[in-house]
């Protein structure tokens, strides 16, 4: 198509500047430099780099990137050549090859169009959908195969639930032990009072000894609380700081992932559009004018992929460290809990074994009599008042005897 025009067609650069340059690359053992080429005759006046593969001479050098235009190979111009011819030119050179290029000075923000934003939103929606649901809704899916982070996320959620359950159980355990220690303290106070008031020396000493044992158990319980409480703090730190921080990192990773997938989907759509126009024999404007829009998306995809790879690496490292901390921390916390409770029960057993004072001989008769001595009977004030009123209203027997018996009229008669 452009042979008749002799490539005398104005390029639509979309305001993106280019800077010429050249780079010499050392080929690898497979005689490759690690780039894929697109464009070229007969549909596009420019021949450009589509992708730079990882761990290849071009990627390790870092000079050329996706979207850069190739203008020559070892000083030979490639104007008017197809991408297959240029690939053969590069393969024919052994050892070092010099690539002449026009560097695309693209701004990634220029490629972040509304279409990319909407694609990111769509990816968020279909992330948790099954393939059947997405197909039924007519939503295309761009997913990462063998994404191990999905399983790691599920493991992280299970770990969070485990720590949450341990935290609640530890709180309840501390609360119960505190109430138990207060109960032992109350027992100690009661038996101490009984021992002080007990007149029998042997029984008094036994009650006091038993009271001291319960007070010691109360101290052991407080010591247990002080030892286990840092465990609760550590669990809360892991649950409320470490895991949320990892979730935030994963959230950032997902945002970068969806952006990268959106650019991948955009590139595929533009490729399909180009292939359709070629099949119909109709020229596509963006391809005929240098395909700068497509090259901009290629550059944005490459940079998004680099960010995605770095973020993925960071997330994997952070989750690996979190797993190691989880394994080490959970063992340490459980050992501290078991050892503390074991010491508590051993100390309680030792104290109660020494305080085996039962049966206690108590002289109940003597104690009851002693408690009952010198105690006046309690009388209610109201009963005393009633007795006084009765005494005032009824004459005494002496008075009635002096006056004689009552007559029929109810008056006293003399005998």
UniProtKB/Swiss-Prot annotation:
Disulfide bridges in this chain: none
Acidic residues bias spans: 377-391
Disordered: region residues: 376-415
Database matches in PROSITE patterns: AH, PDZ
Domain AH: 144-357
Residue stretches making up the PDZ domain: 22-105
Pfam family, one: Arfaptin
S-palmitoyl cysteine lipid sites: 413
GO molecular function: actin filament binding; Arp2/3 complex binding; metal ion binding; phospholipid binding; protein domain specific binding; protein kinase C binding
Keyword Metal-binding found: yes
Compartments it resides in: Cytoplasm, Perinuclear region; Membrane; Postsynaptic density; Synapse, Synaptosome
Subunit description: Monomer and homodimer. Interacts with CXADR. Interacts presynaptically with the glutamate receptors GRIA2, GRIA3, GRIK3, isoform 3 of GRIA4, isoform A of GRM4, GRM7 and GRM8; with NAPA and NAPB; and with BTG2. The interaction with NAPA and NAPB disrupts the interaction with GRIA2, conducting to the internalization of GRIA2.
Protein name according to UniProt: PRKCA-binding protein
Originating organism: Macaca fascicularis
